[in-house]
Amino acid sequence: MITASNAEVGEVWWRLAYRRVRNIKLPWIPVFIMLLLLVCAGFSPLVAPHDPTAINILDSKLAPGENLNYPLGTDILGRDMLSRLIYGARTTVFISLVALGTGALAGTVIGLVAGFREGWFDAITMRAADAALGFPTILVAMVIVVIMGAGIESIILAVLLTVWARFARMIRGDVLSIKDMDYITAAKIAGVSMPMIIWRHIFPNTVNTLMIITSLQVGQVILLEASLSFLGLGLPVGEPAWGIMVSEGKAVILDVWWLSLFPGVAITVVVLAFNYFGDWMRDALDPKLRRL
């Protein structure tokens, strides 16, 4: 964690972080994979060669390379595999951004307030965080989706309720380590309000931890969404989502092997890229956080 003096707080933390990062070699392969994912997600209609939901029985089960119009082949309904993979990236990025962003916001606010105020709020929220972290993530997500029903809203809520606790725990730890510093005490004596102290003096010193946790959690969120979709607890069947595509191909994997292979490879490569980038962020910004 990078801490700053009273005069530096709020304006220097990002410069210190930048100086640390710029001297470390950027992992270009993971970065390229992440950029490719974002391009596919943001420009799916322009990048995809076909409509991912268009059915063409005459071109069903085309193997990769058998027809140049379908370089990755087609599924049992004649839908283009490449287009479905590209549109699947949009689904993955949308769910990850919304769910992880909401979970990070909730966890950060809870961690900041709990660490600064302590007392009953700290006790209640941290016991709730312990409970959330004590259960397997996939089990909690499955219970939520079963109760609410399959759909994108259920997946987002499931991810939110499984990631907020880690953010809250780590941010609270940062707050406890700096809340008694001289410049914080001086701000309290001067009558500065709690929200202003948190925003101007404490939050800037937690940004590094927030960035590291977020980068490390993206891969887990993608894997969780794919797992729920594979189990039939995610998006509706037929949607171009990677987990659903793997599930649709499992029954014919010996005959039409590419149905499960390509989305499975996409999930694996993207998750590994984000995990590697998260490790790089952790080592670059704060090697002490290697326990994450």
Where are these regions (language model features)?
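Hydrophobic/aromatic positions within or immediately flanking transmembrane alpha-helices
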Residues: 30-31, 139, 155-159, 185, ...
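Gly/Trp-centered helix-boundary motif
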Residues: 1-108, 112-113, 120, 138, ...
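Residue-level hotspots within pore-lining transmembrane alpha-helices
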Residues: 90, 101, 132, 136, ...
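Conserved polar catalytic motif of the HATPase_c/GHKL fold
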Residues: 170, 205, 209, 213, ...
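Amphipathic cytosolic juxtamembrane alpha-helices at the membrane-cytosol interface
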Residues: 79-94, 98, 118-126, 176-180, ...
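Generic hydrophobic transmembrane alpha-helix motif, especially the helices
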Residues: 71, 75, 81, 105-107, ...
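Amphipathic alpha-helical segments that mediate coupling or scaffolding at interfaces
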Residues: 20-21, 85-88, 92, 113, ...
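Glycine-rich helix-loop "coupling/hinge" segments at transmembrane-helix boundaries
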Residues: 133, 144-148, 159, 174-175, ...
